[in-house]
Structures are given as C-alpha cells and as structure tokens.
C-alpha cells in the first residue's frame, strides 16, 4: 500500500500523525481527539490535538500512562510501516519532541508525583535539565548512586511500557493506521468525529 512512498516526507508525516491519533483513539482513559492535522505550524510538521471533556485539576496514573503511549504513537507508526531503519528525525529527541515529552513525563511521575512503587511517595529533585534523572538528582540532592540508578530504571520502565503499549495497538490495528494516514494525505485535517467514522464505519469526509 505504501510501495514507492518510503522516504517521502509527506508519507512519513501522515503515518506519524496517524499513529498518534490511533493510539489516542484506543486509550479510553485519555482525552478525546479534537483534530489531527499534517499542516505545519511553527516547528511542528503536524499535530494531534486532544481536548478534555471537562476541566481537570489533576491526572490519574492511568491517564498519564495513556499519555506516554500516545507520545510514542508517531515513532512506532513509522517503525511499523517503514521499518526501524527508516524512522525519521521527527520521531527523535530534542526539546519539545515526542521522546522529550515522554521522558519528562515519566521523570515527573517517578520523582515528583510519587507514582513509582519502587521509589515511593517521595519528591527527589527539581532539576529538569538532564535526560538521565539520576544524574540531575545527584547534582541537586545528596542521594546515593544506588538511588539514582533506581530512579533511572523506573523512568525507563514507564517509557518502555508506553512504547510497548503503542506498538501493541498499532500492530494489531495496522489497517486502521493505513486508513487514517491515507485520509490525512487526502484531507490534511481530520476532526475526532471524522477519525471515529473512518475507523468504525469506514466512512470518509465528503469532499
């Protein structure tokens, strides 16, 4: 279905945003999709926007784990469709990237929100600059290297869980991923309702 399009920036972008959208759609504990678009805006080549159904003043562990999976939806979609060797830099790291957001979120869950059974309900540090939390903790607090390594391990565990959840969804629902990606090529922007209709009813927007 994608023969001849591998390496096309547009095709990768459609698949990437389609991956975010499909993982999000399959996470009942996460916010509903408002829209998905491949129209560039600022530094973003495309985006999937989610809006909560009501005002929230906090988030559950289940919600944040769903967010981790959604963060990896784009990268995993590229991997599933094009193969690991064709994953783009758009799915990589850097400030504001999917990997950066996932790492920062997992870090906060472990060190700020007390959501790690291993580390317990303790706040371990404020420094958000280092990718490897153990190092930043060592810089801001006199914790042992053993504790720093445990923190890194817990962060990695959460990140891996999100990545694997995204991969499970996109592998099992690969046909839906193709549908959304192809629709994004055609229409460029899809609402949450249109995405639901494409997945559940094979019904596409009218031109």
Residue spans for each PLM region:
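Soluble catalytic regions of large protease machineries
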Residues: 13, 21-207
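Single conserved hydrophobic/aromatic residue that forms the stacking wall/gate
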Residues: 1-7, 12
């Amino acid at each position: 279905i994608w023969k001849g399009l591998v390496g096309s920036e547009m095709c990768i972008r459609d698949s990437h945003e389609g991956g975010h959208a499909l993982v999000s759609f399959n996470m009942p504990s996460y916010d509903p999709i408002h829209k998905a678009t491949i129209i560039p805006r600022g530094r973003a080549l495309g985006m999937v926007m989610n809006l909560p159904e009501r005002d929230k003043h906090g988030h559950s562990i289940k919600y944040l784990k769903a967010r981790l999976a959604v963060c990896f939806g784009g990268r995993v979609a590229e991997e599933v469709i094009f193969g690991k060797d064709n994953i783009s830099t758009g799915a990589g790291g850097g400030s504001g990237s999917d990997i950066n957001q996932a790492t920062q979120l997992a870090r906060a869950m472990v060190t700020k929100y007390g959501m790690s059974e291993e580390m317990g309900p303790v706040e371990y540090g404020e420094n958000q600059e280092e990718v490897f939390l153990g190092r930043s903790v060592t810089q801001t607090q006199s914790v042992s290297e053993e504790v720093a390594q445990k923190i890194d391990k817990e962060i990695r565990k959460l990140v891996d869980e999100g990545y694997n959840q995204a991969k499970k969804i996109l592998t099992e629902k690969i046909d839906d991923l193709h549908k959304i990606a192809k629709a994004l090529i055609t229409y460029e922007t899809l609402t949450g309702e249109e995405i639901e209709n494409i997945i559940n009813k094979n019904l596409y927007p009218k031109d």
